[in-house]
């Protein structure tokens, strides 16, 4: 990480490093869903090399501008940025070898649409490598409603793990492989609840956060089309 631009490191709000288990190869085309400040774009760009291509998609113009600055500082010329939603990617059918995403899909209400779109843009045998936030059980309806009312960081849209992985498999993905699971500590939970920052995300009630301690996990997984 020492060679990553300091701005990209400062803007990083992920829950893992999907490029570390995406099995990226030289010359591949990669789509990064919700690229944010660009740290995973840079890591992926270096892995696929000058003959490869990395496309970063984000709906927030300010994040794309910051990602552009970070990519320019990195010196990479194989990274492209595009405004848009992760449910509608500017790629043709079968146009990508890999789709990565880092702590973003939990924020999207229609997760099935995201994975249908990832399936569409991947070539046969292509893969997803995802870091995301899930819960170990179904949360109390009132508690979930309060999180969703504030869309509390990465907690507001987190699904129960089994239901989430089942949804992905139902869209057609196979060979599901869980790389790692990590139960968030109370301190990590607080940070995730206010991602990307207190200026953007209101703080959830302390008692609501206490109610989900031990029930929120980051997971890293890979699957193939």
Q: Predicted regions span which residues?
A:
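Class I SAM-dependent transferase core
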Residues: 1-31, 207
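A short SAM/SAH-binding and catalytic strip from SAM-dependent methyltransferases
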Residues: 97-110
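Class I SAM-dependent methyltransferase SAM/SAH-binding core
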Residues: 17, 26-88, 113
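A short glycine-rich, Lys/Arg-flanked "PGG" loop and its adjoining helix->strand segment in the class I
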Residues: 112-127
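Short alpha-helix
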Residues: 156-172
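Short, glycine-/aromatic-enriched active-site segment of Class I SAM-dependent methyltransferases
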Residues: 134-155
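C-terminal lobe and adjacent flexible extensions of AdoMet/dcAdoMet transferase-like proteins
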Residues: 171-225
């Amino acid at each position: 990480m020492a060679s990553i631009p300091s701005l990209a490191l400062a803007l990083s709000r992920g829950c893992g490093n999907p490029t570390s288990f995406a099995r990226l190869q030289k010359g591949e085309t990669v789509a990064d869903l919700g690229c944010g400040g660009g740290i995973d774009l840079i890591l992926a760009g270096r892995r696929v090399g000058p003959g490869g291509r990395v496309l970063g998609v984000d709906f927030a113009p300010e994040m794309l501008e910051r990602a552009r600055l970070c990519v320019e500082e990195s010196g990479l010329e194989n990274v492209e940025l595009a405004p848009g939603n992760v449910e509608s990617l500017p790629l043709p059918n079968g146009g990508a070898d890999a789709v990565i995403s880092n702590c973003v899909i939990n924020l999207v209400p229609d997760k099935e649409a995201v994975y249908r779109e990832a399936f569409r843009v991947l070539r046969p045998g292509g893969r997803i490598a995802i870091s995301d936030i899930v819960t170990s059980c179904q949360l109390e309806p009132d508690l979930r409603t309060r999180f969703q009312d504030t869309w509390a960081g990465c907690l507001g849209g987190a699904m129960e793990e089994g239901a989430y992985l089942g949804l992905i498999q139902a869209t057609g993905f196979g060979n599901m492989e869980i790389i790692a699971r990590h139960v968030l500590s109370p301190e990590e939970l607080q940070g995730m609840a206010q991602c990307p920052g207190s200026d953007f995300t209101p703080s959830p009630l302390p008692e609501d956060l206490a109610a989900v301690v031990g029930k929120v996990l980051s997971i890293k997984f890979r699957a193939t089309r």
